[in-house]
Every structure is written in structure tokens, then in C-alpha cells.
Amino acid sequence: MHYPDRLRKVYDFKTGKQGHSYTAVGNTFLVKYLERLQMRCHRNLTDEQIQAEVEHYIRLARGGVVLVSPFMSPAEEAIYEAAYKERLPMVHIVNRGLDGKFIYPSGRDLTGCTDGFMLVLAPYADYSPETAAARITRSQCLDMNGYAADIASIAQKEAET
């Protein structure tokens, strides 16, 4: 089932405890779910540890928890793949702006938005060939993880029990 209306951009979309402003595309109701969990995994996990993280977070998402993350580390990317395959609810925070008439999420993010199980949030307004090609900085990574923590309603430790 496709929901083309979910491709309508929402500018100045405020959410989270701090009320940060984003450009949003997708299912904006996902930030209203009672259980939203920041998904953050260390970059240097082994294959076995990554598989354990995938199983853990997918089990939570199957139970109705919305996964909130920039999906940057290899483990987070693996969780994104598994959640996408099962069409589980996700909020994807991206490091590029979505402002501009023809700037939209691409690939699977676009499909996830139109299918209703994904919300893409862009905390940065600008989008240009320069910013699109620029390598993400550590500061941006920390900021995006901070945005995910702000949107989450469940602390990481609570979800592990």
C-alpha cells in the first residue's frame, strides 16, 4: 500500500523534548508513538555482536517500538536493512538538508516514506552538491545521535530489560 501524500514535506516540523525543528518527509505520526527508542550501536562490533544487536532491536520493533537513528554504524545499517525488509517503524535522521523543490529522500527511504513505515527527518536545511558530497563530520554524527536521543521516549537501558 502506497501513501503518496506522505511525500509532502513538512517544514519547521518540531518534535522531541527540546522542540528541535526539522524538515520532515514520511509518516509524521511515528513521533507520536508511545515507545520510541534511540538505536545507537558502537562502530567496532564483531559480526556476532552485530547479529545480536539486529535480533535485539528487531524484536523490540516487532513489539511496536519505533526505532530512531541516523543509522550510521555498520550495526545500525544492518538493523536498518532488517527493519526495512519487515517494514518496521523507523525514524531516519539524515545528514543532508531536504529543503528545495525537488529534494526528497532517495531510494529505500523514499519507498519507506510512501509505504508509511518511515519518517525521514533532516535537521539541516541546506542542500547543495557541496553538502551532499561532503564527508560527514564527527560533530554532525554526535549532533544526529543527540537528535535521536531527544526524540526517543525510552532510554536505552530501559529497553534492554
Locate the predicted segments by residue.
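Glycine-biased, small-residue-rich flexible motifs in mid-sequence functional cores and linkers
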Residues: M1-T161
